[in-house]
Amino acid sequence: MFGFLNLNKPAGCTSHDCINELRRRLRLKRIGHGGTLDPMATGVLPIALGAATRLLPYLSDRKAYIGTVRFGMSTTTDDITGEICQEQGASHLTLAAIQEQLPQFIGEIEQLPPAYSAIQVAGQRLYARARAGEVVSVPPRIVTVYRIEVLHWQPGRYPELTLHITCGSGTYIRALARDLGTALGVGGTLAALQRIESGGLRIEESHSLESIAPEHLPLCSPQEVLSHLPWLELNAAQLNDWYHGRAVICEGLPPADSCVGVTFATACVGVGISGGDRLHPKVVLKE
């Protein structure tokens, strides 16, 4: 098996749970995913099968989410699965006040990861250390938020705001909910999250975990999933050099140090790095 699956992750399980279930269903050990989703979250989870796992680092880092922020409370996990650590209500909050604060969360921003996250500190996941009662100091990270669009506003004692967010890898929507609530002085936590796009895959073409089986394997090709890369078709002579790890002389390559998808007879044979008139093998896939 070789290729990608556009999996619609269900709520209540981890991304690794999905991998384990697919290994059982497909009787295939070599399976990986292209970006962790929290257990409460649903939506697009790119899955790589077989040697396609070697292409996971080259997925587009652009992701899109629909998230609902609940104001008037804060939680230990920055989402509604955590314990409430502050609760004051926010019935006075208006959409106009929120819209005044949103621009500061667009662009390159500093973001402090949630205490309960998969980031490793001193070889341990943050969530494991938090569950053990440790308070770990983690420096903020620079993340990119390309766009925030308001989809729905529901006033009330604990008003809720639904947003369409487009961002880069490493952005925590939970942290965005927390920080927006802090900026408004009322607290905020993430009430719901769906990833609608990741690695070039969209929710409209996703498949449920229950529907995937060896006899029903809706694979996407590397060319589809890595459509953000330029692609180059090799001839037979170039392919021989490629398979032996030698740089291939090519015309019309993109600027130096660009990633390029490589095919032969329309089949993906890897990824290279451009350098002048030569393409240097980075990932070589052989049949």
Curated annotation (Swiss-Prot):
It is an enzyme of class 5 (isomerase). One of its GO terms (molecular function) is tRNA pseudouridine(55) synthase activity. The active site is at D38 (nucleophile). GO terms for biological process: mRNA pseudouridine synthesis; tRNA pseudouridine synthesis. Pfam families: TruB_N. NCBIfam families: TruB. This is tRNA pseudouridine synthase B. The gene is truB.
